[in-house]
Amino acid sequence: MSDILKKIELYKREEIAAAKATVSLADLKAMQAGQSAPRGFYQALAAKREAGHFGLIAEIKKASPSKGLIRPDFDPPALAKAYEAGGAACLSVLTDTPSFQGAPEFLTAARAACARPALRKDFMFETYQVHEARAWGADCILLIMASLTDDEAKRLQDESFSLGMDVLVEVHDAPEMERALKLSSPLIGINNRNLRTFEVSLTVSETLASMVPDDRLLVGESGIFTHADCKRLQAAGINTFLVGESLMRKDDVTAATRALLVGEAAIAAE
């Protein structure tokens, strides 16, 4: 595990302990009962693939450890609507506060503002967090293989499935991919960012994609800024992308989302 992931795990474990002391599992289950049913995160992406379209998981992210503040005028409901209007299939919403200035209420508000399924983007270590995710309205959780053992990943996956949520399993190298493929989740994310150095290269996705059988749905993550980047990854068999920073920095988020998905030339030809 990288140094940054170790630091994150330390504060996450403290956060979880504090949350458990404040909100019981029974409380979370009561909150879940008040949420609308999961919207089918994987199914929304699979439908795009089957139709021959790019699938976009559009990220609502205020800040990051590597870039600092990304969007000062941060309005999760407005961003959710803008992404939906631009053609995004799903949302990803940061709920981690120390590193990303995220919050649970951002997830709840963004999902309520549109009809798209939403991922709780956070660092998951305990099943309590899975119940938090569903209580806050999430349709999917993220599992980062670099920070979990195989047993932990399976336990979190199975808990998520039991609540009707999907699971995006994230990897960065070949050993992590081999471990991810032992899980039953069909959603595999390849993070092009090295969490030790923060360097980003699309070659990571291109290299690892060949390891994955056709019954899985691959998601390219990080370093995707243009339609040309999407086309490049498509050549490697990746038709689904998680994009945050490059869209969050644009004034017209809807137009930027559409341009990423179909290209400026296609828009100009309309």
Curated annotation (Swiss-Prot):
Disulfide bonds: none annotated. Keywords: Amino-acid biosynthesis, Aromatic amino acid biosynthesis, Decarboxylase, Lyase, Tryptophan biosynthesis. It is an enzyme of class 4 (lyase). Its EC number is 4.1.1.48. The gene is trpC. PANTHER family: INDOLE-3-GLYCEROL-PHOSPHATE SYNTHASE (PTHR22854:SF2), TRYPTOPHAN BIOSYNTHESIS PROTEIN (PTHR22854). It catalyses: 1-(2-carboxyphenylamino)-1-deoxy-D-ribulose 5-phosphate + H(+) = (1S,2R)-1-C-(indol-3-yl)glycerol 3-phosphate + CO2 + H2O. InterPro entries: Aldolase_TIM (IPR013785), Indole-3-glycerol_P_synth (IPR045186), Indole-3-glycerol_P_synth_dom (IPR013798), Indole-3-GlycerolPSynthase_CS (IPR001468), RibuloseP-bd_barrel (IPR011060). Belongs to the TrpC family. This is Indole-3-glycerol phosphate synthase. GO terms for biological process: L-tryptophan biosynthetic process. The keyword Lyase applies. It comes from the Bacteria. SUPFAM superfamilies: Ribulose-phoshate binding barrel. One of its GO terms (molecular function) is phosphoribosylanthranilate isomerase activity. The keyword Amino-acid biosynthesis applies. Pathway: Amino-acid biosynthesis; L-tryptophan biosynthesis; L-tryptophan from chorismate: step 4/5. NCBIfam families: PRK00278.1-2, PRK00278.1-6, PRK00278.2-4. CDD domains: IGPS.
